[in-house]
Amino acid sequence: MGKVIGIDLGTTNSCVAVMDGKNAKVIENSEGMRTTPSIVAVTDDGERLVGQPAKRQAVTNPERTFFAVKRLIGRRYDDPMVEKDKKLVPYKIVKASNGDAWVEADGQTYSPSQVSAFILQKMKETAEAHLGQKVDQAVITVPAYFNDAQRQATKDAGKIAGLEVLRIINEPTAAALAYGLDKTKTGTIAVYDLGGGTFDISILEIGDGVFEVKSTNGDTFLGGEDFDMRLVGYLADEFQKEQGINLRNDKLALQRLKEAAEKAKIELSSTTQTEINLPFITADQTGPKHLTMKLTRAKFEALVDDLIQKTVEPCRKALKDAGVTAGEIGEVVLVGGMSRMPKVQEVVKQLFGKEPHKGVNPDEVVAIGAAIQAGVLQGDVKDVLLLDVTPLSLGIETLGGVFTRIIDRNTTIPTKKSQVFSTAEDNQNAVTIRVFQGEREMAADNKMLGQFDLMGIPPAPRGMPQIEVTFDIDANGIVNVSAKDKATGKEQQIRIQASGGLSEADIEKMVKDAEANAEADKKRREAVTAKNEADGLVHSTEKALAEHGSKVAETERRAIEDAVSDLKEALKGDDAEAIKAKTQTLAQASMKLGEAMYKQQAEADAKKDAAKDDVVDAEFTEVDDDKNNKKSA
């Protein structure tokens, strides 16, 4: 069995880790970084860039650079959060045929699962390069507060990337695994996870290798991206006041503002003031305009204070659901890049009444936890038991549009529960089961996961037929629902696929596209390698011709020059095979030049040796001062 990797698929950055003996190890990517920006771009010539290369060109290609796509995963186009996102991002968010929110570049649409798959592919390649073997199984993390549609969409992303997703695990739970694996003490901990796009709080009990989640809460649309955009808005407003130009209408300027905001936010975690300097941000008839502004930590904290306060209520709810007080929490573990912000740490300290634990790397701890869970599933990590929970209540719509819960939130998973319902009308021969997830009392106010029909119920007065509805949640938090007529034994079941979501055919097509693109990327890489080798050979041959061309026969020199011209012509195209063939021809032709150079060198060396042979050894006398005796050579 090959290695199972652990992947933290983040909103802003992603990270991959693997078990190395008894410890989990974070793997560096091809750029030498331990985290990879969760950014995908499509260039003018259709090339796809992932990670740092995509981030580097974002300013000049804002409409085709997709970032923070995790916030769209498993969401409908008409979701209020998608409406909010559409106003904030420079790329186009469109409505897919299934009603989901997708992204578009140059008329080509991509599902958020597909974009996430490109990032997962990069993680997979990073692990394969490090391990020197194929990797096709992974544990992938998701925010604890992700609903069923978002979990299913993440699993689909893994499949498109060519990975069998053995387990979807919650990010705070993964962080707790990484924090508590080598600790002997038992107790209750809180994991406060404020990342790039989502916020989670989980309360866990740890002891003797058992990690039991007592409760979880959060907000799947609150994170570093919101802090960045708040600062972008402030900078744009200040610039408009000063210069009378609205930068929000300029996508290129907006992307530069976003990069500057992210940089300033990071700097203000370790310094009390920073300067934002963006020369030539825009221009009008009077000439170019520059943005220069000093920003203090206090000002930034005031701008984002309400965002930080938004994390407080979910923490209180999680404590209440777990049946513990803040004083009973032994340790608060900080996770996610935003938890580095001093103001965030101050709010956490006030809330829990203790200094938060800063002993874990907030950017890497989730991937490490995922790798540990991968080790558990592989049998490499022993005596660890993970008991997670479902974050939201599950149930069905009953008479009057009421939401009837069948599984309450914070129920340990995997779990299975049944409840018996009946018909609402006389002689009703079919019932429609509408499945919802959420905490509101009316079904319509919750997230609809899907629906199915149970047909062929025998005619009977209303209230007589007995229909047993069973909910089954697996260890990934993914839901199966079945309905059975107890009189006839007829059963109907669905694995919940959101009314949107990707069908098997969609996933299969995307898998094929990913494979085809991997082949195209490989060819493109081969062409670049071939071009580099060819360039090097042309340069060295031309240099050698200039210095030693007179030492070879005229016909041979002409053959070398012709081969150089042919190779230069081939270098204008992208045909790797043609470049390799012409490189080989030039290498063969230039061998004569090499022979002439070596022959000349050999003759020069021979002359030196001959000169040495003509040297006569001289006689010398060594005088010993003490004894005044003589030695002869």
Curated annotation (Swiss-Prot):
Domain of life (superkingdom): Bacteria
PROSITE patterns, A to Z: HSP70_1, HSP70_2, HSP70_3
CDD domains found in the cross-reference section: ASKHA_NBD_HSP70_HSPA9 (cd11733)
Modification Phosphothreonine occurs at: T198
Coiled-coil intervals: none
Record has Oxidoreductase as a keyword: no
Alphabetized SUPFAM superfamilies for the sequence: Actin-like ATPase domain, Heat shock protein 70kD (HSP70), C-terminal subdomain, Heat shock protein 70kD (HSP70), peptide-binding domain
Keywords: ATP-binding, Chaperone, Nucleotide-binding, Phosphoprotein, Stress response
Example GO BP: iron-sulfur cluster assembly
Signal peptide interval: none
Expression triggers: By stress conditions e.g. heat shock.
Function: Acts as a chaperone.
HAMAP family: DnaK
Name of the protein: Chaperone protein DnaK
Lineage: Bacteria, Pseudomonadati, Pseudomonadota, Alphaproteobacteria, Hyphomicrobiales
Name of the gene this protein is made from: dnaK
